[in-house]
């Protein structure tokens, strides 16, 4: 019987996951996403007046219901419910996002679930996250999903695997050095690898992500209007689409902050360059992640003699790579043995 392998990548901005694998090729992997927001409520919000037709799910955790899903912004209040800190994976919000993704995968059992971590915390939190993901997950509405085994990967490693697989370069890159740059919502991650083997000493992440840029612009708007401006999602949309914002019926152009945005991007790239040392032996510079468009100029300046490789739908590069790695792992004898040993299913909160 074919094993069911799925992947989920909970970022600070968006939760990405695999919904299907089509014909089995990397290009056939189907992905989806929703904002990484989880709004708590003492009662099931799916039963509340006005929630009909809303594409969200109520995930029960610890006596509360956390509303997550594509239309979660319709459940938002004035407070932007995010949990952006180093212990993010230990929060009920994180678990609610994972379980929301599991719910949308529409499977009852997953033999191998592949998840990701920022590079800086990968070694410290890998075992804990794999344990947290394994077991029976209550995904709401009387449904549950059983995960038999979990595998955690460093987030940019997924993008490296995705790039090498899609371009049929896995063997060709075996002795070549690659640098994967992954600007996310909270962290700016990078990964150095020879072939598919990571160089942990050169790989890392710093807290210089898209959220820093959005907050910088929000602070400027706040000074202009004389009161706090907190709608970071509107700023993000305007930046991605090259649009102006309407604030109190007046137009505000985020492009005016471009020089300050570039300083943040250069700070992140400079931190990376100090860590990796010289770039003369780097054959592949791969830029991925939802924040790539904000950091592209700084990356090109740092690697002026290199071609910067970009990918289609860069936001999903990591989760596609997780799926490829998980599918390959599930075909190994080691995976079969582990599955037989771990056949019992744990129960509880994030078992």
Region roles according to the model:
Residues 1-178, 197-212, 224, 230-351:
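Nucleotide/phosphate-binding catalytic cleft detector across ATP-hydrolyzing
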Residues 183-189:
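Ser/Thr-glycine-rich phosphate-binding loops at phosphate-binding pockets of nucleotides
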Residues 190-195:
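PRPP/pyrophosphate-binding module of the type I phosphoribosyltransferase fold
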């Amino acid at each position: 019987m074919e094993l069911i392998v799925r992947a989920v990548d909970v970022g600070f901005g968006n939760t990405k996951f695999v919904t299907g694998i089509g014909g089995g090729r990397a290009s056939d992997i189907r992905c989806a996403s929703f904002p990484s927001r989880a709004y708590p409520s003492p009662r099931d919000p799916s039963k509340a007046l006005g929630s009909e037709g809303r594409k969200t799910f109520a995930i029960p955790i610890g006596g509360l219901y956390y509303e997550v899903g594509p239309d979660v912004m319709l459940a938002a209040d004035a407070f932007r419910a995010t949990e952006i800190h180093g212990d993010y994976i230990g929060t009920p919000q994180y678990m609610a996002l994972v379980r929301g993704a599991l719910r949308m995968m529409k499977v009852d059992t997953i033999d191998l679930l592949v998840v990701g971590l920022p590079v800086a915390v990968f070694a410290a939190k890998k075992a804990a996250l794999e344990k947290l993901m394994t077991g029976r997950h209550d995904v709401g509405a009387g449904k549950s999903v059983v995960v038999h085994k979990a595998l955690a990967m460093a987030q940019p490693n997924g993008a490296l695997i995705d790039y090498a697989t899609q371009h049929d370069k896995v063997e060709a890159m075996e002795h070549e050095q690659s640098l994967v740059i992954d600007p996310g919502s909270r962290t700016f991650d990078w990964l150095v690898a020879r072939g598919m083997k990571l160089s942990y000493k050169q790989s890392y992440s710093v807290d210089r992500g898209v959220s820093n840029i959005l907050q910088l612009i929000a602070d400027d708007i706040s000074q202009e209007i004389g009161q706090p401006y907190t709608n970071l999602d509107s700023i993000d949309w305007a930046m991605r689409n090259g649009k102006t914002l309407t604030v109190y019926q007046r137009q505000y152009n985020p492009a005016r902050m471009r020089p300050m945005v570039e300083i943040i991007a250069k700070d992140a790239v400079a931190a990376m360059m100090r860590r990796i040392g010289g770039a003369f032996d780097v054959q592949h510079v791969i830029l991925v992640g939802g924040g790539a468009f904000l950091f592209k100029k700084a990356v090109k300046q740092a690697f002026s003699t290199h071609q910067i490789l970009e990918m289609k739908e860069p936001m999903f590069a990591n989760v596609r790579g997780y799926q490829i790695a998980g599918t390959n792992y599930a075909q190994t004898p080691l995976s079969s043995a582990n599955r037989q040993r771990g056949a019992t299913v744990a129960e509880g909160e994030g078992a």
